[in-house]
Each structure stands twice: as structure tokens, then as C-alpha cells.
Amino acid sequence: MEQDLLKLDGRIVVVSGAAGGGIGTTVTSLVARAGATVIAVSRSEANLDRHVAPLASQGLLVTPVAADAQTEEGVAAVMKSVRGAKGELYGLVNVAGGAAPSTWCPTTRLSREDLRALFAQNLESMFFMSQAVAAELKAQGRPGSLVSISSISGVNSAPYHSGYGAAKAAMLSMVKTMALELALDGIRVNAVAPGPTATPASRTYVGDDPERDRRAIPMGRRGRPEEIAGAVLFLLSNLSSYITGQCLTVDGGINLKWSHLADDNTPLFLKDENFRAAMKR
């Protein structure tokens, strides 16, 4: 029965940022394997050929669309593909986003250009895609589910991530507002906030360091793209039919970890001899 609730047969789901070889590509694959027709969106035709075309060759119902979700023309191209696809429009997954290494800097050094680019890449694409899909669902009188990929940087503060974190936090605020506005239309709106995840982009920017991850993350490792995709499928599916306006954090417990913790997740002050002596008094 639970497996049936995860099925998306006959439904169309749009995935933006689908061709980076990480979370978006994995979401595209998993949602297609759940039976959906996926409109896979990316600005890069080369990446679509590399990461999305093989999914279609496996018999999955995946339609690649080269479009920029930040632009009016790009959103229009996506919706044209939706209207030409077989099935009923149902879902959207906003994965497009990210932060260029130049934006990982102290707040005092973040340029106007970088801040604007961060909001365009992470917030505007999410807003305009959600707006278009929600309007289409309302016009058709259909229920649906919209899921956006935020970040733990948008949930808690993160040094050197002021612009990126602000954009992802704004996304969460928008998710809540849209959830309220669309609830009576049967359209649910939620977000997933990944923690450190092993993707091609993360390897490029911060490399692989299992020992660092073991110290920093309570579960001792980075997340896998399929673990983020699983959370997305849950929020798309009927298993979450009474959930809206929420952010599901998938981070291996890193948000639970107080900054003054030792490697074994115990408070550093417990290792202080004077403190231990005071506890015995």
C-alpha cells in the first residue's frame, strides 16, 4: 500500500536544475522511476545530453528542455513543453540554484553584483517557476505539489554564506506564503533543506575529506543525492498529502550540533577539569 502512495503514474513533474549530475539529476531519475513524466530543465544542452538523455534511453519518461528558469522566455518554454507532454500536470521540483565560490566570503566583502546574482539564481527561478506551475494547476482545477530545494544555510546562520543563506531563507518564507495561498486549491508547497551532500559541485568546491565530515556531521558522513531525492519524492507523493508549508531538513543531524562540541558530539566543557570538578561539588 505504501508503495502505491509513492506512485506518480500519469502525472507530469517539472524539475529545474535537472542536469548537473547531482541532486537534480537524481531527483529526475527517481521521480521518473515512480512513474511520472518528467520535464527536465537545464540551461546547459551539453549537460542535458550527458546526464538526462541516458535516462530517456533507459525507457524512463523524461523530456529534456534547455531553458533558463530565471527568464520569462525560459519559463514560457518550460510551460510549452508541459502542455505538449502526455499526462496531467501535477508537480514541480525547484533544484536550480547554487553559489559561485566568489560569493563565499565575509559579509563585508560581498559585492552588489554577487548578491543580486545569488537572489536571481536561488530565489527568482524558484518563484517564477512556482508561479507558472501553480497558475496552470489552478486554471485546470487540479491539485499538485511544489517542492523547492533550500539549504541548511537558509535555516541557520552560516559564516561566509550571508548572501546565499539570505536567498535560501527567503525561499522558505515564500514557500510558507504560497502554501497558505494555494491550500484550498489542493496545491501543497514545501521545501527540502539539504546539509552537506556529495555532489559533483561540492567535490569541486570543497573536495572530499571523510575525516572532516566525520568530525563535523553527527552521522559522520555527507549525504547522498538519492537521500535528498527520497525526501523530495515523499513530499511529491500522497504519503505527504496533509503536509504543506514545511521544510524537511536532510542533513545528518548537523543542525543539531552545537558549535562547542567535541569530535564525539559531547560538549567541550565536559572535558575541562575545572568544570568536571565543579559538577562533583
Which sequence ranges carry the predicted segments?
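Short C-terminal tail/terminal secondary-structure segment
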Residues: 2-4, 22, 233, 244-281
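Canonical Rossmann dinucleotide-binding motif of NAD(H)/NADP(H)-dependent dehydrogenases/reductases
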Residues: 6-39
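Active-site helix of classical SDR
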Residues: 16, 130, 167, 175
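Conserved mid-core segment of classical short-chain dehydrogenase/reductases
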Residues: 76, 98-116, 160-163, 203-207, ...
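Catalytic Tyr-X3-Lys loop
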Residues: 90, 108-127, 147, 171, ...
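Alpha-helical segment proximal to the catalytic Tyr-Lys
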Residues: 135, 180-184, 241
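Residue(s) in the substrate-gating loop at a strand-loop-helix junction
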Residues: 151
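C-terminal helical subdomain
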Residues: 191, 211-243, 250-252, 277-281
